[in-house]
């Protein structure tokens, strides 16, 4: 059956390319949720053009990591991350990096698969300079405090109520029409006492 393998691969690739285009839609998470649900959170520069693997239909970007905030244990003995991987098509949530500034730093929160960093359109990837000082504080130090006990619970429609004392209602989208509202830019869901989490200002935690 070996002679048919190239043909089969070609057919699969053709079906992939001619499939109806469907926009990938997702709601961006609160930065704390992105931090807690990611295996690896780093600051890095995109320094290379994307390279597409025609076999896996994934593309990779060469990056230069400047800081790691989460993932030391998950990464194991690997000292550095040199590439980030994503689906090669936007219709299946592939991330396309549009900035041509190779000196610009980005906050990248992604998943590790077989030791490789993977991201999608739905991943938290943002220019470091676009983050508020409170968000930078969160990624650097504070978000991790709420990962085990607390959950940011999106409130997208009324009525909306807490399902647990450890949940914090996230109303940015409902009240401000954007996931980048006040709670996202300035607050973290952190333990107040055993069994209770509340929104707390990251400003007051800044040195």
UniProtKB/Swiss-Prot annotation:
UniProt-annotated binding residues for Zn(2+): 24
Marked site positions, Involved in metalloproteinase-binding: 37
Domain NTR: 24-147
Location (main, coarse): secreted
Region annotation (Involved in metalloproteinase-binding) ranges: 24-27, 90-91
Role: Metalloproteinase inhibitor that functions by forming one to one complexes with target metalloproteinases, such as collagenases, and irreversibly inactivates them by binding to their catalytic zinc cofactor. Acts on MMP1, MMP2, MMP3, MMP7, MMP8, MMP9, MMP10, MMP11, MMP12, MMP13 and MMP16. Does not act on MMP14. Also functions as a growth factor that regulates cell differentiation, migration and cell death and activates cellular signaling cascades via CD63 and ITGB1. Plays a role in integrin signaling.
InterPro entries named in the record: Netrin_domain, TIMP, TIMP-like_OB-fold, TIMP_C
Signal peptide: 1-23
Keyword ATP-binding on entry: no
Disulfide bonds: 24-93, 26-122, 36-147, 150-197, 155-160, 168-189
Modified residues (Phosphoserine): 178
Entry-listed glycosylation sites: 53, 101
Domain of life: Eukaryota
Name of the protein in question: Metalloproteinase inhibitor 1
Annotated organism of origin: Macaca mulatta (Rhesus macaque)
SUPFAM superfamilies xrefs: TIMP-like
Any GO molecular function: metalloendopeptidase inhibitor activity
Membership in a protein family: Belongs to the protease inhibitor I35 (TIMP) family.
Keywords assigned: Disulfide bond, Glycoprotein, Growth factor, Metal-binding, Metalloenzyme inhibitor, Metalloprotease inhibitor, Phosphoprotein, Protease inhibitor, Secreted, Signal, Zinc
């Amino acid at each position: 059956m070996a002679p048919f393998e190239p043909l089969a691969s070609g057919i699969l690739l053709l079906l992939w390319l001619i499939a109806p285009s469907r926009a990938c839609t997702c709601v961006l998470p609160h930065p704390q949720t992105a931090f807690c649900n990611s295996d690896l959170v780093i600051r890095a520069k995109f320094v290379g053009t994307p390279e597409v693997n025609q076999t896996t239909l994934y593309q990779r970007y060469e990056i230069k990591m400047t800081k790691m905030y989460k993932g030391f244990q998950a990464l194991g003995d690997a000292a550095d991350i040199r590439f980030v991987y994503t689906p090669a098509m936007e219709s299946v949530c592939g991330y396309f990096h549009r900035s041509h500034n190779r000196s610009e730093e980005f906050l990248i929160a992604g998943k590790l698969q077989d030791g490789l960093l993977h991201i999608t359109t739905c991943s938290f990837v943002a220019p470091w300079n676009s983050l508020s000082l409170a968000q930078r504080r969160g990624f650097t130090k504070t978000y991790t405090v709420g990962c085990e006990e607390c959950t940011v619970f999106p409130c997208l429609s009324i009525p909306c109520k807490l399902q647990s004392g450890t949940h914090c209602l996230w109303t940015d989208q409902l009240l401000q029409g954007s996931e980048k509202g006040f709670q996202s830019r300035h607050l973290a869901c952190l333990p107040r006492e055993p069994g209770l989490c509340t929104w707390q200002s990251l400003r007051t935690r800044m040195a």
